[in-house]
Amino acid sequence: MNDTKQQPLLIVEDSDEDFAALTRIITKISTSNPIYRCEDGEEALDFLYREGLYADKTAPRPSLIVLDLNLPGTDGREVLTALKKDRDLQTIPVVILSTSSNPKDINACYRQGVSGYIIKPMDTQRLNKLVENFLSYWFEAVELPSSTIIS
């Protein structure tokens, strides 16, 4: 069994408030998961492809990606498309956390192979509960792919 307490988590989120809420919940559930943040799609692709500021080949491969769809510049839809087309990255589970409740977005994301789609509620307590349940599932119930690079 993988030690999910050590698995890196990539959060692609432009909202400081939403990122702060996510990290607060994550540290409540698991204090030792490394958390990486990218604020837009271009930064996320650089992180995943180890380009630009992330050109260090020892940069960790995330075992789980939490992706917002509505990002500045390259949006989450484009990040998801690139990720799922890449043989080395397509096995990383991606969970969408977005304000979009549009059935077209939800269906398109599932067609591209997301592992889950969570609509961000406006209520903070509801958001906390949803994220806590989702993270408990990912960190406690399932086996995540190894964070080591498979080439």
Predicted features and spans:
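The feature encodes the CheY-like receiver
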Residues: 72, 102
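Short, glycine/charged-rich "phosphate-handling" switch motifs in NTP-dependent
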Residues: 115
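A Lys-centered signature of the CheY-like receiver
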Residues: 120
